[in-house]
C-alpha cells in the first residue's frame, strides 16, 4: 500500500496530501487546524508528525465527516461540528487566538459526498436534490429551486458557475417548477431530472464536460454559501495565526483559486505607498500581513492518473508576518 493510501480512507483519496501538509512547515509541538476534515487524510498525516505536545483541531460541517473523525482516539485531536468560518469563535473558546501555527483548507465537495447519490451533489447519479454540506441546516437545493425567481437563478448560475447559458437554464428550471404547481405534478426534486432539463436547455454541448457541470456547481456553492465562507475564513486566519503561522489552501475551481490568490497577494503587498516617500523598511512592511510561500502547486501526472478528480486542484501557501 502506498503512503498516499495509508492516510486516505477507502472511499476518499486525499488530494495533494503531502504537498498541503508540507506547506504548513509543521513544528512537532505546534497547534494546527484542519478546517475541512472530510475523511481525515490530512489530519492523520499531521498527527503522525506531531509529538505528544502537539495539537490538532479539526472542523467539518458534514455529519458523516464528524462520525469519521470521532473514530480517531487521540488526546491531541479535537473535532468541531461547524463550518470553517467559525474558526475565530472556536479559537476564542479554546483560548488559542494568535497561537495557531497553521491552518489547512481543502475546499469544495469531497469524493464521499459526490459518490453518495443521497447527498444530491452528482448529476451522474439519481438522488434527492439536496446539495447541503450540513444536512441539518438550511434549504435543500430542491426547496430553493421551487421558490427562486428566474432572474435570481440566472444570476447564481452566471456568478457561481460562470455558465454562459444561465438565462436559458434558469428559464427552463423555473418554468418546469411553475408548470408542476399548476398541473399538480412533481416539481424538480431529484438530480437526474434536473441534469436532463439543463442538458435540453443548453444549445451547444461540450464533448469534454457534461452540460449540467457548471449549473450543479453554482447551485451547490450558493446553497452552502461557499465563497462567503471562504472569504470569511481567509480574513479570520490573520487573527488566529501566530507569527510565522502558515495558511495552506487547496482549491478546485477558478472562483475559489482566484479569491485565494488575490487575498494572499493583497495581504503580501499591504497598502500601496506613493513612490519616493521616505519610509523605513519596518514602516513599509507594517501593513503586510502575509508572505506568499513559493508558487502555486498542482498535482503531478501520477496523482491525476490515480485520481482524475484531482486534475483541477491548486495549492497556495502563505505565512503570517509579525
Swiss-Prot record:
GO biological process terms, alphabetically, are: rRNA base methylation
Task: Return the InterPro entries for the record.
Answer: RsmH, SAM-dep_MeTrfase_MraW_recog, SAM-dependent_MTases_sf
Highest taxon of source: Bacteria
Say if the entry is tagged with keyword Transferase.
Answer: yes
Which family does the similarity line name? Answer: Belongs to the methyltransferase superfamily. RsmH family.
- Matching HAMAP family, A to Z? 16SrRNA_methyltr_H
Q: Under what name is this protein listed?
A: Ribosomal RNA small subunit methyltransferase H
Amino acid at each position: 500500500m502506498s503512503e498516499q493510501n495509508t492516510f486516505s480512507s477507502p472511499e476518499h483519496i486525499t488530494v495533494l496530501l503531502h504537498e498541503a501538509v508540507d506547506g504548513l512547515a509543521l513544528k512537532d509541538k505546534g497547534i494546527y487546524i484542519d478546517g475541512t476534515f472530510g475523511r481525515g487524510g490530512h489530519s492523520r498525516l499531521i498527527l503522525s508528525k506531531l509529538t505528544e505536545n502537539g495539537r490538532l483541531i479539526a472542523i467539518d460541517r458534514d455529519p458523516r465527516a464528524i462520525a469519521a473523525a470521532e473514530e480517531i482516539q487521540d488526546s491531541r485531536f479535537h473535532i468541531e461540528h461547524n463550518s470553517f468560518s467559525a474558526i475565530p469563535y472556536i479559537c476564542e473558546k479554546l483560548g488559542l487566538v494568535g497561537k495557531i501555527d497553521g491552518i489547512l483548507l481543502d475546499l469544495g465537495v469531497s469524493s464521499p459526498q459526490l459518490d453518495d447519490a443521497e447527498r444530491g451533489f452528482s448529476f451522474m447519479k439519481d438522488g434527492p436534490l439536496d446539495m447541503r454540506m450540513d444536512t441539518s441546516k438550511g434549504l435543500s437545493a430542491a426547496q430553493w429551486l421551487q421558490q427562486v425567481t428566474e432572474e435570481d437563478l440566472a444570476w447564481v448560475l452566471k456568478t457561481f458557475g460562470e455558465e454562459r447559458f444561465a438565462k436559458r437554464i434558469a428559464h427552463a428550471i423555473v418554468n418546469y417548477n411553475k408548470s408542476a404547481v399548476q398541473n399538480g405534478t412533481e416539481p424538480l426534486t431529484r438530480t437526474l431530472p434536473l441534469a436532463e432539463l439543463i442538458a435540453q436547455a443548453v444549445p451547444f454541448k461540450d464533448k469534454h464536460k457534461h452540460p449540467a457541470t457548471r449549473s450543479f456547481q453554482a447551485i451547490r456553492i450558493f446553497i452552502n454559501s461557499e465563497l462567503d465562507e471562504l472569504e470569511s475564513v481567509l480574513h479570520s486566519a490573520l487573527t488566529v495565526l501566530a507569527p510565522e503561522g502558515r495558511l495552506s489552501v487547496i482549491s478546485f475551481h477558478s472562483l475559489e483559486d482566484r479569491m485565494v490568490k488575490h487575498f494572499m497577494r493583497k495581504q503580501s503587498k499591504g497598502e500601496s505607498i506613493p513612490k519616493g516617500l521616505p519610509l523605513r523598511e519596518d514602516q513599509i512592511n507594517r501593513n503586510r500581513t502575509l508572505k506568499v510561500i513559493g508558487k502555486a502547486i498542482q498535482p503531478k501526472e501520477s496523482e491525476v492518473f490515480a485520481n482524475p478528480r484531482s486534475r483541477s486542484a491548486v495549492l497556495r501557501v502563505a505565512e503570517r508576518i509579525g
